[in-house]
From Swiss-Prot:
Role description: The beta subunit is responsible for the synthesis of L-tryptophan from indole and L-serine.
Species whose genome carries this gene: Thermococcus kodakarensis (strain ATCC BAA-918 / JCM 12380 / KOD1)
Cofactor: pyridoxal 5'-phosphate
Keywords, comma-separated and alphabetical: Amino-acid biosynthesis, Aromatic amino acid biosynthesis, Lyase, Pyridoxal phosphate, Tryptophan biosynthesis
Protein name (record): Tryptophan synthase beta chain 2
SUBUNIT field: Tetramer of two alpha and two beta chains.
One Gene Ontology molecular-function label: L-serine hydro-lyase (adding indole, L-tryptophan-forming) activity
Family affiliation: Belongs to the TrpB family.
Example of a GO biological process term: L-tryptophan biosynthetic process
Length: 442
């Protein structure tokens, strides 16, 4: 069972949650003064239109016609499936649906914002985009967006993933991007971390610092971000807006689930449904799933913190493990992040979104069952959502209740096979830090 929308149903507007939040979002702070950040200072880092969108209180932002046309070419609208084989394997009365973002040409949801960011940069006359990537899905998406729109792209990829997922590098190079393992010797912050540990596995926080440092050396370059900030999450809401139309062919969901690193794929599916809850028009539950190795939602603190490891970004009020926290090298490289989207942090604080955390072995076990029943090998990041959906379906089975579960399968795992090999061979390690030293000063 699946629902497929025609191209005419590609959303014409992105949904901006800012005007609907239960409390005003705390302003980002200038890292030099600790005063609210002046938007003008962000223009040296981001494309101008993206800064405007970040600050906008308009509930909807029009999607440019050119972006919608490319959305059609790269696989939007994406299909929504019912996981009937998984339901039977679990013996659950719950009905499980998933939105499959792996159907895009780059294999994940990341292309939704990559195209938007590249479009606005090109329109401004920017020549080069620089970014970070964890597992490589975001770097892949931006590399293709740059190729399609005539922009050079440079990617700093967390070293652990650079080594675990070598074919991600190949795809990015095919799309014309430069790619470097992070930490690298190309930046001051990279050299600092390499001096501390020549084999440093890196992480998203370090890669972000390197990308920003790189951008600040070139007037014709701008930084593109794959998650966390509101304009990124807003671009992803095409997922949930499509899913709302597709679920009309089936039934209303009771619970909506997604994995979380910075929060963009979760927000992409959930925020259009959250809007209906905040307006009092519907009742849904929302479950955000993170790894126990990077538990910013379940064990972090809600404080102002840098978005990167080097302290280059504005300080944002968010759930954080501390910007100097070293995230262990789990195979879900896209979830190896110390912080969280500020908008999602607010929703968690108000009890609208419930966070849960899992070890990577139990996540891979859920992914294994999903692959055997539904035929799709999920990205390790997306497998966290599968684990959350399975646990919820088994809870419904124990309690003898029917329930409709919708989750975001945010990407495929065809280039993540080293993690699956380690899982099958019993070599996968679980990480659950007892203490977070980076929080000692918070």
């Amino acid at each position: 069972m699946k629902a497929v929308l025609p191209d005419s149903k590609i959303p014409k507007r992105w949904y901006n949650i800012l005007p609907d939040l239960p409390e005003p979002l705390a302003p980002p702070l200038d890292p030099e003064t600790d005063e609210p950040m002046e938007p003008e200072k962000l223009l040296r880092i981001f494309a101008e239109e993206l800064v405007k969108q970040e600050m906008s209180t308009d509930r909807y932002i029009e999607i440019p016609k050119e972006v919608r046309e490319i959305y059609s070419k790269i696989g939007r609208p994406t299909p929504l499936f019912r996981a009937t084989n998984l339901e039977r394997a679990l013996g659950t009365p719950a009905r499980i649906y998933f939105k499959y973002e792996g159907a895009t040409v780059t294999g994940s949801h990341k292309i939704n914002t990559a195209l938007a960011q590249a479009y606005y940069a090109k329109r401004q006359g920017i020549e080069r985009l620089v970014t970070e990537t964890g597992a490589g899905q975001w770097g892949t998406a931006l590399s293709l967006a740059g190729a399609l729109l005539g922009l050079n792209v440079r990617v700093y990829m967390a070293r652990a993933s650079y080594q675990q997922k070598p074919y991600r590098k190949t795809i990015m190079r095919l799309y014309g991007a430069e790619i470097y393992p992070s930490p690298s010797d190309r930046t001051e912050i990279g050299r600092k971390f390499l001096a501390e540990d020549p084999n440093h596995p890196g992480g998203l926080g370090i890669a972000i610092s390197e990308a920003i440092e790189d951008v600040l050396r070139d007037e014709k370059a701008r930084y593109a971000l794959g998650s966390v900030l509101n304009h990124v999450l807003m671009h992803q809401t095409v997922i949930g807006l499509e899913a709302q139309e597709q679920m009309k062919e089936f039934e209303e969901p009771d619970v909506i689930i997604g994995c979380v690193g910075g929060g963009s794929n979760f927000a992409g599916l959930a925020y259009p449904f959250v809007r209906d809850v905040l307006k009092g028009e519907a009742e849904y539950e929302f479950i955000a799933v993170e790894p126990k190795a990077a538990p910013s939602m379940t064990r972090g603190v809600y404080k102002y913190d840098y978005g990167d490891s080097g302290g280059y970004t504005p300080k944002m009020k968010m759930h954080t493990l501390g910007h100097t926290y070293y995230v262990p090298p789990i195979h879900a490289g896209g979830l190896r992040y110390h912080g969280l989207a500020p908008t999602l942090s607010v929703l968690i604080n108000h009890g609208i979104v419930k966070p849960v955390a899992y070890h990577q072995n139990e996540v891979f076990q859920a992914a294994h069952l999903f692959a055997k029943t539904e035929g799709i090998v999920p990205a390790p990041e997306s497998a966290h959502a599968i684990k959350g959906a399975i646990d919820r379906a088994l809870e419904a089975k124990r309690e003898g209740r029917e329930e409709v579960i919708l989750f975001n399968l945010s990407g495929h795992g065809f280039l993540d096979l080293k993690g699956y090999e380690d899982y099958l061979d019993g070599k996968l390690e679980d990480y659950e830090p007892e203490h977070f030293p980076a929080l000692d000063n918070y």
